[in-house]
Amino acid sequence: MQVSVENTSALERRMTIGVPAERIETEVNKRLQQTARKAKIPGFRPGKVPMSVIRQRYEDGARQEALGDLIQATFYEAVVEQKLNPAGAPAVEPKSFEKGKDLEYVATFEVFPEFTVAGFDTIAVERLSADVVDSDLDNMLEVLRKQNVRFEVADRAAQNEDQLNIDFVGKVDGEVFAGGSATATQLVLGSGRMIPGFEDGLVGAKAGEERVLNVTFPEDYQNLELAGKAAEFTVTVNTVSEPKLPELNEEFFKQFGIKETGIEGFRTEVRKNMERELRQAIKSKVKNQVMDGLLAANPIEVPKALLENEVNRLRVQAVQQFGGNIKPDQLPAELFEEQAKRRVELGLIVAEVVKQFDLKPDDARVREMIQEMASAYQEPEQVVAWYYKNEQQMNEVRSVVLEEQVVDTVLQKASVTDKSVSYEEAVKPVEAPKAD
């Protein structure tokens, strides 16, 4: 077998492979002999059909099958011989395909980039630390109460946090516009659900009152036909209802499936959940900084095939998440290219760190992670048992643990600054940078 390789770009390879005619004929004859043993042809006993008859009837099909298998087999033999690591399937172009002659074909494909992860000492990480103090716990209890608020009709003027039942008709340039009208809609004042000025304009309104609100759609409003335009809404208030927060009692505690009784038992369980959330938030922020640092210090070119595969995965995830009748390939690839590129780059860089430092998932950390996740459930022992019986889930946990070990490895070499902050600051999501 003859092999030559041409580097057509940083990652693309054009490999020409020649397969001797003798090898082709051997494979063709092998298939014809297999066919002869089971062929049923009128006038001949099974297994006794002359090879000349078998060849006349079946040689073309056997040759096509043999050539297809040989191209696949010799391609992988060639990449092993040339020490290449293909990233995706090759595009195959036959050059010589004549019977009785050597087979020659060209395989064009991309390879994984070869690089060494460096620049660990250029990575700067701010590692937060925080505690759950009593005031944080009190605030969380109020949040839980507000999440379970109920509303009672009140005979008074509307205030912020009241729930109004309203009918409204919206007009732009004196014309009713699509989606601008509704009846019997529930609206909590101050929720920010409506465009600026709408909810504020209903503060002080009473049941049965009609108000005309003059507002302006934001410049970045999702409906471009309405963005930046002035609108007039005629609103009729049907009812005004005031919020009633639930009492912190046994009935309230049961809604959260907490076995501990009494306010102190409830506070203890809520604190545990907050501490678990805090640990995850701090860990996530450190990981994001490490990954950002690795990307900045190690710019690499990634194979187009991997990017396309990742874009397609993100398309499928988007359809599964948001539903609807749309098909994944109907979503524009541009929506996912930036995220796909980051994920592919990080996947390659993280894999290389694992290889460079010979990292393997730590069994103790795997157990600890499973127990941490299980502690959020009412029957943690059952959750732990479920994980250990499910190999796919175990592999996912091992993968997460291995990423954490990569982060720890980088932190040992990076510039790390510790900073003490409040619980609220520690768990606050990091805002994505705005596009220019």
UniProtKB/Swiss-Prot annotation:
GO molecular function terms noted in the UniProt entry: peptidyl-prolyl cis-trans isomerase activity; protein folding chaperone; ribosome binding
Subcellular location, record wording: Cytoplasm
Residue span, PPIase FKBP-type domain: 161-246
Pfam families tied to this protein: FKBP_C, Trigger_C, Trigger_N
Principal cellular location given in the protein's record: cytoplasm
Presence of keyword 4Fe-4S: no
Keywords: Cell cycle, Cell division, Chaperone, Cytoplasm, Isomerase, Rotamase
EC number(s) reported in the record: 5.2.1.8
Catalytic activity of the protein: [protein]-peptidylproline (omega=180) = [protein]-peptidylproline (omega=0)
PROSITE patterns (alphabetical): FKBP_PPIASE
Cross-referenced InterPro entries: PPIase_dom_sf, PPIase_FKBP_dom, Trig_fac, Trigger_fac_C, Trigger_fac_C_sf, Trigger_fac_ribosome-bd_bac, Trigger_fac_ribosome-bd_sf, Trigger_fact/SurA_dom_sf
Gene3D superfamilies (alphabetical): 3.10.50.40, Trigger factor ribosome-binding domain, Trigger factor, C-terminal domain
UniProt keyword Chaperone, yes or no: yes
GO cellular component: cytoplasm
Function field: Involved in protein export. Acts as a chaperone by maintaining the newly synthesized protein in an open conformation. Functions as a peptidyl-prolyl cis-trans isomerase.
PANTHER family in alphabetical order: TRIGGER FACTOR CHAPERONE AND PEPTIDYL-PROLYL CIS/TRANS ISOMERASE, TRIGGER FACTOR-LIKE PROTEIN TIG, CHLOROPLASTIC
Free-text note regarding domains: Consists of 3 domains; the N-terminus binds the ribosome, the middle domain has PPIase activity, while the C-terminus has intrinsic chaperone activity on its own.
Classification via HAMAP family: Trigger_factor_Tig (MF_00303)
Name of the molecule in the record: Trigger factor
Provenance organism: Pseudomonas savastanoi pv. phaseolicola (strain 1448A / Race 6)
